[in-house]
């Protein structure tokens, strides 16, 4: 449970926002699963609290999802907040799995972050989208049972994307 005044702040400043208070911190996967069960939407936008978005950032991705019903999850480029010319470590521009089962992503090789020179401005199929800023089709998400609650934090987005791919989604 939150130990700062963030819940009070939300209730006072944003009274129309439905605040979900869980009795304990069960982790990223369980927390999102519990929250998303209360949301009636075609798409979910999962956004970490430390991600800053730009104006009109949602529309192009919703247009992409609307254009192809086989797309289960996607993301925008995620750039480093402090060094905006470089990709962010967590997910950068979507990821893949190598032949040894190791996840990697566009915009980052191991701990080396690439400079954003527009090389990933194209819409391209990736194996997984980052949970830091993930758009996901609700129908596909629930067809695979949502996030696996065994993942407290990290790699849950790779797992759910893998399971959605296994049933025919991109």
Question: Which residues make up each language-model segment?
Answer:
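A conserved acidic beta->alpha catalytic loop
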Residues: 1-8, 24
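Alpha-helical elements of Rossmann-like donor-binding domains used by nucleotide-donor carbohydrate transfer enzymes
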Residues: 5, 9, 30, 34, ...
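Glycine-rich, basic loop-to-helix element that forms the pyrophosphate-binding segment
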Residues: 21-39, 49
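Acidic metal-phosphate-binding loop of nucleotide-sugar-dependent transferases
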Residues: 26, 51-52, 78, 151
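Short aromatic/hydrophobic "clamp" motif used to bind/position activated sugar donors
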Residues: 44
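Conserved donor NDP-sugar-binding/catalytic core segment of glycosyltransferases
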Residues: 52-102
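Short, flexible, basic/aromatic active-site loop/helix in glycosyltransferases
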Residues: 76, 94-126
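A short, conserved alpha-helix in the catalytic core of glycosyltransferases
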Residues: 121, 127-170
